[in-house]
Curated annotation (Swiss-Prot):
Subcellular location per the Swiss-Prot or TrEMBL entry: Cell inner membrane
Pfam families: UbiA
Membrane topology of the entry: Multi-pass membrane protein
HAMAP family xrefs: CyoE_CtaB
Name recorded for this polypeptide: Protoheme IX farnesyltransferase
Protein's organism: Pectobacterium atrosepticum (strain SCRI 1043 / ATCC BAA-672) (Erwinia carotovora subsp. atroseptica)
Superkingdom of the organism of origin: Bacteria
One Gene Ontology cellular component: plasma membrane
Entry keyword set: Cell inner membrane, Cell membrane, Heme biosynthesis, Membrane, Transferase, Transmembrane, Transmembrane helix
Length: 296
């Protein structure tokens, strides 16, 4: 039973978000780490993300039964009652919001609320089922965790927070489109209007390429704005160029789109993890030492 309650929170998504929270937090901390705040932020965001995932499982149970990848999920098989699941999700969310408010600051809590509302209320309940722009809206909620981590320390939404929002939102797009391509039949069967299904895979490839270019520019802004150092800059540039090269390889005539998309998806995880690690490590230089000053 405990395993089922854990599964419904989507632990993989929680773990992925924690990596980005750590990146945002340590970027803002600049080497001066408040460990109680760090722990509280990680736990608070984890609880909020878990709550959102449980609510998403409730909302998507009719869709999940149509998809090969999700047909064996806990709620699809009726292993937990709907009423208990809703109470469980609510308690997780309340605990997460309360912890962020008390242990971090109101800004971090309200950012978590906004991310939660966008994911559950806007994306899951409506946009995912009715609009090709659902992925774009969902990307905003996916970018919330690193911004929460950053603002838990800074207690302000500054240029650094905005750049993080851009980086992680732009990353979500090619990442999500890649999933939709190699899981094309699942999305088609569930009648989910993702771009590859609605507009075709060739159009999706164009969007993927453009979003990766935009992502690359956004990642460089973190160094050029003085929030991360040259080591981060080198890794960001290398990761972006490699990811773009992989995207461009998708235009070859003999390419297997499903295999290509899966590789692109896997590398997207490598890319964002690398950036999260590097912004954590290379943020320990003096705050706001603008890289451009070294180039004059």
């Amino acid at each position: 039973m405990i395993k089922q309650y854990l599964q419904v929170t989507k632990p993989g998504i929680i773990f992925g978000n924690l990596i980005s929270v750590i990146g945002g937090f340590l970027l803002a901390a600049q080497g001066r780490i408040d460990y109680p705040l760090f722990l509280a932020t990680l736990v608070g965001v984890s609880l909020v993300v878990a709550s959102g995932c449980v609510f998403n499982n409730v909302i998507d149970r009719d869709i999940d039964k149509k998809m090969e990848r999700t047909k064996n999920r806990v709620l699809v098989k009726g292993l937990i009652s709907l009423k208990v699941t809703l109470v469980y999700a609510s308690l997780l969310g309340i605990a997460g919001f309360a912890l962020l408010y008390v242990a971090a600051n109101p800004l971090a809590m309200w950012l978590a609320v906004m991310g939660f509302v966008v994911y559950v209320g806007v994306y899951s309940l409506y946009m995912k089922r009715h609009s090709v722009y659902g992925t774009l809206i969902g990307s905003l909620s996916g970018a919330a965790p690193p911004v929460i981590g950053y603002c838990a320390v800074s207690n302000q939404f500054d240029a650094g927070a905005l750049i993080l929002l851009l980086i992680f939102s732009l990353w979500q797009m090619p990442h999500s489109y890649a999933i939709a391509i190699f899981r094309f039949k699942d999305y088609q069967a569930a009648n989910i209007p993702v771009l590859p299904v609605v507009k075709g895979i060739s159009v999706a490839k164009n969007h993927i390429t453009l979003y990766i270019v935009a992502f690359a520019i956004a990642t460089l802004m973190l160094s050029l704005g003085g929030y991360a150092g040259y080591k981060y800059l080198i890794v960001a540039a290398a990761v972006s160029v490699w990811w773009l090269g992989m995207a461009l390889s998708g235009y070859k005539n003999a390419i297997d789109d499903r295999v290509w998309a899966r590789k692109l998806f896997v590398f997207s995880i490598v890319a964002i993890t690398s950036l999260s690690v590097m912004m954590s490590v290379d943020s320990m230089a003096p705050a706001h030492e603008v890289l451009l000053t070294y180039l004059r």
